[in-house]
Design a protein with these regions (language model features):
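Extracytosolic ligand-binding ectodomains
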Residues: 1-6, 17-375
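Extended, low-hydrophobicity acidic Ser/Pro/Thr-rich
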Residues: 8-10
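N-terminal signal peptide c-region/cleavage motif recognized by signal peptidases
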Residues: 13-15
């Protein structure tokens, strides 16, 4: 027979246990394939956020809440991305952080929308992503229109380039970025002397670059990933092409110097990263980067802090709604003002970040060096 006091204690313990809940938040990115380093970097950012949140005393839906990260691999493949999205819907996740690139985020977004599950991408830049009319779709970085435009204007107005040759990898990301660069460069008075296309798995660009060489462009613009940019830079050097090399956030990584080897020279590469913090506001971001390096033993690749902020923003909306139910916290997410390590996060009616910054970088001594922050 259980003593009365013990029975009461057991009852209280059981009651407290029943009042706990596990809230599943997913992160999706390429953990395998040519841009696995980007996916792993973002996943690390999500894990840091989850671990910090679980150290706090958070109550949602009247229950003590523990957050669980469901980390999934889409291999940067649209078909795998949609399969993963359906898996997460079936698992009844409360929200999704991801995907990493536009080619996976866009097809997956329809599945999340149909299920009413909020999705915040920390790195998708295709303008199309937030132009589908989905109220569940958000991003915490600037889009390709802003990225490509900034690069085109910089080429014309700061580099004083007159001509450019353009190559894109035909992905939603690469094509969109190249189109925006061409539009801005032409508007600023530049001439596009050649346009060529490849794919996101290619590493041999000799035929394309040989055709470019005859045109003598001031700038070679690449709408693609660092996995392609590295070999392209090596082949440009071998062919004696002296042009500046420009591209977007997917080439603007800490891995580019390793991928390019001796093909990259000081100040040759100009790239733009969606996001950026002015010097006056860098204290929180620098602290995050230090904490990341202590935890993982390496520097961030590019978007880990934006992934961290995306997840923290989602949970902030849950806390404001006092619920992890997507129907209840989605309205709070749409009107959120969250101070993140990358700056203030709030969204416009489409789900784009308001006042998204863009940072331009070059490389010197195999290290990325900031040129300017613009909007």
């Amino acid at each position: 027979m259980i003593p009365l006091a013990a029975a009461a204690a057991l009852s209280l313990s059981t009651s407290a246990y029943a009042q706990e809940q596990a809230v599943k938040i997913a992160h999706v990115g390429p953990i395998t394939g040519p841009i696995a380093h980007l996916g792993k970097d973002n996943e690390n950012g999500a894990r840091m956020a989850i671990e910090e949140l679980n150290k706090q005393d958070i109550t949602l839906d009247g229950k003590k809440t523990r957050f669980v990260l469901m980390a999934e691999d889409d291999a940067s493949d649209p078909k795998q991305a949609t399969a993963v999205a359906q898996k997460l819907v079936d698992a009844k996740v409360a929200g999704v952080i991801g995907h990493v690139n536009s080619g996976t985020s866009i097809p997956a977004s329809k599945i999340y929308y149909d299920a009413g599950i909020p999705q915040i991408s920390p790195s998708t830049t295709s303008a199309k992503y937030t132009q589908q009319g989905f109220n569940t779709t958000f991003r915490v970085v600037a889009n390709d229109s802003q990225l490509g435009g900034a690069l085109g204007r910089y080429a014309a107005n700061t580099l004083h380039a007159k001509t450019a040759a353009v190559i894109d990898d035909r992905t939603a990301y690469g094509q969109g970025l190249a189109e925006e660069f061409i539009k801005a460069a032409k508007a600023a008075g530049m001439t596009i002397v050649a346009t060529q296309y490849t794919n996101d798995k290619a590493t041999d660009f000799n035929a394309i670059l040989t055709s470019f060489k005859a045109k003598k462009p001031d700038v070679v613009f690449f709408g693609g990933l660092d996995a392609g940019a590295g070999p392209m830079l090596r082949q440009m050097k071998q062919l004696g092409i002296q042009a500046k090399f420009m591209g977007g956030d997917a080439i603007c990584t800490s891995d580019l110097p390793k991928l390019a080897g001796d093909g990259i020279s000081n100040d040759q590469v100009i790239c733009a990263e969606a996001g950026g913090v002015e010097e006056s506001g860098r204290k929180a971001l620098d602290a995050y980067k230090t904490a990341y390096k202590i935890k993982y033993g390496k520097d961030i690749v590019i978007y880990a802090p934006y992934t961290y902020d995306a997840l923290m923003t989602m949970v902030d909306a849950m806390q404001k709604a006092k619920s992890a139910d997507p129907k209840k916290y989605l309205p709070e997410l749409a009107k959120i003002h969250h101070q993140g390590v990358t700056g203030m996060i709030s969204f416009d009616a489409k789900g784009d970040i308001r006042d998204g910054s863009i940072t331009l970088y070059t490389y010197r001594g195999a290290q990325r060096s900031q040129l300017t922050v613009t909007k």
